Amino acid sequence: MSPFQELLADVPQQGRVRWIGVRPESRAEMIELDAVEARREAGLTGDHSRPGPRNARQVTLIQWEHLAVVGSLLGRSVENPVLPQDLRRNLVISGINLFSLKNRRFRIGQAIFETTGWCQPCAKLEQRLGHGTFQAVRGHGGINARVLQSGIIRLDDTVQVEPLDINDPWPPVRQHA
């Protein structure tokens, strides 16, 4: 492994689950939860995500620290912050750079995930939150993930990167960035 590859492989930070939410239907309001079951190839219980191994967007994650960044880019005051449910992601994580999870598997609570790509903003966010939202969220929208091992996720659970296994016959999916 080159020195650069070693730097990419070493993720010493651990994250923490700060918020959990599901959408029972596509345009429904987010439901905030204290715990949720992540189901292999199906996403989160109660979320409208399409089941199946080919769905690369079973679970969406955003970085807690980016909520303030998006709020600032939208010109919001501290008294009117962007809330987790505003950006409609399932899990809000603090303490770890979600971009360091690219091409990696990671554990949250009992569940194991793999990153499948960046979670880009959509036109619906612009309609819901107002003009400029699309540009404010670009680069701060988080990641998409697929559930590899089912398990329960709770508020305050730890987010840990799984060690790289160079002998893995099924390496994590490679993303186009």
Where are these regions (language model features)?
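Metal-cofactor-dependent catalytic cores
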Residues: 1-177
